Amino acid sequence: MLLIHIRSTRKILALGRHVFPSNAFFSVSSRPSLSSSDEVAAHDVASLLKTPNWEKNSSLKSLVSHMNPNVASQVISLQRSDNDICVRFFMWVCKHSSYCFDPTQKNQLLKLIVSSGLYRVAHAVIVALIKECSRCEKEMLKLMYCFDELREVFGFRLNYPCYSSLLMSLAKLDLGFLAYVTYRRMEADGFVVGMIDYRTIVNALCKNGYTEAAEMFMSKILKIGFVLDSHIGTSLLLGFCRGLNLRDALKVFDVMSKEVTCAPNSVSYSILIHGLCEVGRLEEAFGLKDQMGEKGCQPSTRTYTVLIKALCDRGLIDKAFNLFDEMIPRGCKPNVHTYTVLIDGLCRDGKIEEANGVCRKMVKDRIFPSVITYNALINGYCKDGRVVPAFELLTVMEKRACKPNVRTFNELMEGLCRVGKPYKAVHLLKRMLDNGLSPDIVSYNVLIDGLCREGHMNTAYKLLSSMNCFDIEPDCLTFTAIINAFCKQGKADVASAFLGLMLRKGISLDEVTGTTLIDGVCKVGKTRDALFILETLVKMRILTTPHSLNVILDMLSKGCKVKEELAMLGKINKLGLVPSVVTYTTLVDGLIRSGDITGSFRILELMKLSGCLPNVYPYTIIINGLCQFGRVEEAEKLLSAMQDSGVSPNHVTYTVMVKGYVNNGKLDRALETVRAMVERGYELNDRIYSSLLQGFVLSQKGIDNSEESTVSDIALRETDPECINELISVVEQLGGCISGLCIFLVTRLCKEGRTDESNDLVQNVLERGVFLEKAMDIIMESYCSKKKHTKCMELITLVLKSGFVPSFKSFCLVIQGLKKEGDAERARELVMELLTSNGVVEKSGVLTYVECLMEGDETGDCSEVIDLVDQLHCRERPTF
């Protein structure tokens, strides 16, 4: 147990020494004497402190700008009679002197005050420092280490106000263990702990999940005469709910409900409701909310917000709004967190405009968005690929004095990576530093993953090396991104080297990383190496499922190595892993590839006998095999048998059947299957469109299906507009969505250089009120590659006049093309059109960002930015 194993309060000192090693340069065991000029400066400052509003005195600011801790302590010594002035000056000089700004230097100044015997001043300063450090765990640990040094070197001890403030701050920082250690030292120093302090300790332990320790501590305080109250009961509820131990939480709540002295209040109910929501017990949570009214305890804003978030997390946005509408009539005013939860829920559901509407209502109600609110909106825009409005929000934040945090920049960097601009995201890293923020592991993982996805491995590695500058260690996700990228490039050896580096750093790899490497090794044909890695990872207990084995099976399947596949099935059993549906499906695929349809049916029966019932995929693979061998009637029978066994066909099954019918000259049956597919709610896909196009070409040209090898070329190169229009008409009659079909056709036509026909197709669809953003991107890319920027401008104008907005990618392609052609004026006009069409109001603020995004991505430029980031971080304030 936590409380039993604590033997000495020196554990704080040991922890402090481990994290923050002592610096002999700051030793104050012997205080240096001041020079005559320093003495004069100290007296000058001390005299200025007697004037009114001395904090605003420009002469004083100039005097202290480079004042070191020794001179500052002398000033405080000269003012020792006025405790308030001493504390105010201490905090003020630490903000304005470059030699007293750092937490270590503040602690140095505190040591000098204690060494001068100014204990009363020191105690008051300590209370102020504790409050200042109450938001930063690292600074609090440094301060506690300083307290231990003061005790050891000078025999200085904290007084009761210091201890009480320290307990509260440790509880706020979720440092329950240190709160208890502090309590033990407090007792050892002879202080009688009050009820407020006991509550604080119980709360701190519970917030950290030390509920058993909290219960033991509570038993102790009950024995000495204190009573169980609502505060302590609520703390226990919090501890159990945070640990998702709802059984014990409900027991505590039951006890509280029966005792008058600790009756649950609104906070108690809200905590328990939150706990129930966290484990998915929403009905009980809502029942508890209804019970509150019966017990005379009205739901608070926090109660409603918790329930609204739970509904949003389940995608029940409409119900969340119904609950929101219930708040004001019940006397509960929504706060910034309530609105933020709704905005976040809408953004995750892809309803960005509705989220914006909620934000506008929020401001109208005089509730101003927080940084978390803005982050939710920025995340929504970035996930939708709309980086321009996301950057406008950044400028709005800055204008409204809502300082962006690390999460803000992480969202924006991820957004840039999503639209294929990881280099611009690296530039944003520098902007983050300029804002006084330091990147975290998420920042680096986003950037490295983005660079790896685009194949920029040298820059990714340079960024990996720069993590040390911020004392950030790469984690499993960092290395997995790099390993995955090298594997995709066919560089399995390099990927293996990074795995070795990862292990040497003591980073535990997970199943995803292991499977990624095995997949990469398999793709370069190194089966033995893949097996060796697999067996090693199984022995390390990293691989607990057959996913990695399935990867090897898949490689063998594609090579039609059936014997090796069956041997691998035996190895799965030998390693103690249970074959999954995927394992058997891969075996079926291998047998079909080798032409052994009978064998694939045997595997299907084996699955049923082993209790691993086949799903739609093994059936579909066999159906596909039968169709490929011209046995369409047998495929139909298997499809019927599959449905009789309770397995419904999916879009892949329908796709296979459509292709099979077309290849066997049965276009009518293919169209019937498409109709059935649409009626069951499945969307048509590119493979369906390709098969239908092939069928129409065969029918129109009168080509026999024995000439199938030429059909693909004909479908791509010789499809005439009449055939395309007929295909669109038929798909529409069958109930299919023509958007997907048109995007498919545009892609194919542009690949064959028939961009003008693609343009005509998109314009025809646009006249019917349908805008195909992806199709337009493809057309823009095709035109820009041929430097036909006027065509692009005409299409952009037409789309805007139709009430739609082209994508950021389309604008970007044309603007960059115009710049390369030297047409800066038209490029600038298009940038302004981009801002206007995206509803950007603050054009001047966001213009700098957008123009930067429109510039080309240069590798060298990006490397220079990384070097500059390293240099910026390494600049430190002068130390004394």
Curated annotation (Swiss-Prot):
Stretch forming the transit peptide: 1-89
Keyword Metal-binding: no
InterPro entries: Pentatricopeptide_rpt, PPR_P_subfamily, TPR-like_helical_dom_sf
Primary localisation category: mitochondrion
Gene3D superfamilies: Tetratricopeptide repeat domain (1.25.40.10)
GO-annotated cellular components: mitochondrion
Sequence ranges of the PPR repeats: 159-193, 194-228, 229-259, 265-299, 300-334, 335-369, 370-404, 405-439, 440-474, 475-509, 510-544, 545-579, 580-614, 615-649, 650-684, 685-721, 738-768, 772-806, 807-842
Keywords, in A-Z order: Mitochondrion, Repeat, Transit peptide
Annotated compartments: Mitochondrion
PANTHER family in alphabetical order: MITOCHONDRIAL GROUP I INTRON SPLICING FACTOR CCM1, PENTACOTRIPEPTIDE-REPEAT REGION OF PRORP DOMAIN-CONTAINING PROTEIN
Family the UniProt entry places it in: Belongs to the PPR family. P subfamily.
NCBIfam families associated with the record: PPR (TIGR00756)
Name this polypeptide is given: Pentatricopeptide repeat-containing protein At3g07290, mitochondrial
